């Protein structure tokens, strides 16, 4: 945000070597770099976040993030609102995605609430109600899937202003039409 890049501390120790490579690349871009401290219990993975700049909202999962890792990122981004969504996927993006309008503002969200905790589902609907936006509910097969069948990961998306790039169509074609 505004020339700031945050280098996270992955939960998987073998992935932490990536940080040195990423830092070298970012230094050439002349960005301000904030590195997550190497503190016990502080972890965060990129797939566990969606930052929506226009609304200044950070969505975070807690599967591979820790609460103190999420707080570090939220503080560094100076967000107006933090929405934590816990679910059964291995990253937030396996069961949730925001949708942005052409101006870059959140205009709806897509979520597999069947994979979310009750508290997270309530937090999501409270957030959506505060913006008066729809929540498009999808089944597990459009997300990470079930124990017996892998999903199509349609919700694992890249939300861009006016466009949602996702690997598969949603099983309900009306969702793709409406977003």
Give residue ranges: language-model regions.
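The feature marks the mature, well-folded catalytic cores of soluble enzymes
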Residues: 1-179
């Amino acid at each position: 945000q505004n020339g700031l890049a945050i280098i996270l501390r992955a939960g998987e120790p073998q992935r932490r070597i990536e940080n040195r490579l990423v830092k070298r690349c970012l230094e050439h871009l002349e960005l301000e770099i904030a590195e997550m401290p190497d503190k016990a219990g502080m972890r965060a993975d990129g797939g566990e976040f969606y930052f929506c700049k226009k609304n200044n909202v950070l969505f975070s999962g807690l599967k591979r993030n820790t609460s103190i890792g999420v707080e570090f990122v939220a503080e560094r981004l100076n967000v107006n609102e933090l929405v934590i969504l816990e679910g059964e996927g291995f990253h937030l993006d396996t069961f949730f995605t925001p949708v942005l309008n052409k101006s870059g503002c959140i205009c709806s969200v897509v979520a597999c609430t069947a994979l979310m905790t009750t508290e997270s589902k309530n937090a999501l609907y409270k957030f959506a109600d505060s913006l008066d936006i729809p929540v498009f509910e999808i089944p597990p097969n459009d997300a990470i899937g079930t124990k017996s069948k892998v999903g199509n990961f349609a919700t694992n998306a890249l939300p861009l202003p006016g466009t949602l790039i996702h690997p598969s169509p949603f099983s309900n074609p009306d969702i793709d039409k409406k977003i």
